[in-house]
Regions:
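Glycine-rich phosphate-binding loops of nucleotide-dependent enzymes
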Residues: 2-255
Length: 255
């Protein structure tokens, strides 16, 4: 099966959605959605509940098939033809809002289990590797501020630390694109600040798409913002420009 497409006549992209529509029982979750993310870019996605943010992530990862439109990764791979596992193997990792970690195992073993190569939920979502060394684990845990908790049980971590551990489980696979869903939901203020710094650090070496409701956190990310409403993009630009957009104020931020 040929999954390659002709690259669009525009600058190179890591993720390109064009005219993507998805309907569920007559409800249009995505309505001709178009999005362009450059390599090495971190993009924040905001919007009210039901705007299509989760469906967009589901389409990118292969969980949901679009009714129409293009979904292209790395300028040439048609994601609509691939399974979730195949998309993960390409280098797209997703972190859901609720952290999914192995609570009865240590922090370090969580990273090992995520990359065990067994056909588990984790390996299907995030791909697999034959082995990961202790040194590689140390590097990843240091990056997510969990070095001091290497031998702690994951179940003993705070909510924020569990979120960071799941990010570590993604980073160990070295994905090209990370999709991060509401990473600071339920976090303390200090954890939220640390998470903003963490994602800015990750964005130095990876492309990142962050879905988030916390506007203070989005501002701290200091990146281009896309606002969705009823399955379409209604505003895009800096956080200041998007926050001042009357359409965004009306449907999302309130007056």
């Amino acid at each position: 099966m040929n999954t390659l497409v002709n690259a669009p006549a525009m600058p190179k992209s890591v993720l390109y959605l064009d005219g993507v529509s998805v309907s569920f029982d007559g409800f249009r979750a995505l309505n001709s959605l178009s999005l362009f993310v450059e390599p090495g870019e971190m993009r924040a996605i905001i919007g009210p509940n039901g705007a299509g943010k989760t469906t967009m992530m589901d389409v990118i990862t292969g969980k949901t098939r679009p009714d129409q439109g293009e979904v292209v990764f790395d300028d040439r791979v048609d994601l609509t033809r691939l399974s979730e596992a195949e998309i993960a193997e390409l280098g797209i990792g997703r972190k859901f809002q609720k952290p999914t970690v192995f609570e009865s195992h240590t922090v370090a073993d969580n990273v090992r289990l995520a990359l065990s190569g067994e056909r588990t939920t984790w390996s299907a979502l995030f791909g697999s590797r034959d082995r990961i060394t202790d040194g590689e684990i140390d590097i990843v845990l240091e990056r997510v501020r969990l070095s001091a908790h290497r031998e702690r049980l994951a179940g003993d971590l705070s909510h924020g630390q569990k979120q960071w551990l799941e990010i570590a489980m993604l980073l160990a696979q070295d994905p090209k694109l990370l999709l991060v869903d509401e990473p600071v939901a339920g976090m303390t203020d200090a954890e939220t600040e640390d998470t903003a710094r963490l994602l800015r650090d990750i964005a130095q070496t990876h492309s990142v798409v962050v879905v988030e409701h916390d506007m203070a956190f989005v501002r701290a990310l200091d990146v281009k913002v896309t606002c969705l409403h009823e399955g379409s993009v209604i505003s895009e630009g800096s956080i200041d420009a998007v926050s001042a957009d009357e359409r965004v104020v009306e449907v999302y931020l309130g007056r």
